[in-house]
């Protein structure tokens, strides 16, 4: 359990914070959890607190080439708008917050084991471990903002985020939803590549 919890730090709502997160960063100020239902991000995602209360909701437009997504809070107020654009081999997501702040996330430096995304417009950095499905979000002064973890082998695409700078919660939620889409896009590309390789091998035989 200790070894697994070091690399796979996801936890369910109501469970204690991951021991390794606590050891490295202290107790989180707040934790949020996501569930995407019906096997598709386009059906919407609920972001809840430890008690299961829905605090935010994200919904994507059907058949949108730019994967347009809007996030609202529990009262229906607009929180953020996210759009994806593809430049050559790299995806870039543009996020506009309700307060007018604007920033970008790119998968340009994503690799198999260690991923780094510079968040242009904020000066923040998202550092990740794809193998362990964990990501750490740091501010411009290299202080921890949040730790994001994905549940392994979940049909409902579950994430947990431990927040250490609660004043940045809405921005963290926007980054969380964007990351969720980026991970889904990566899975889709890998699946397509595998299918193409299998098809090519069968044809050659």
Predicted regions and their residues:
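Intrinsically disordered, low-complexity proline/glycine-rich segments
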Residues: 2-205
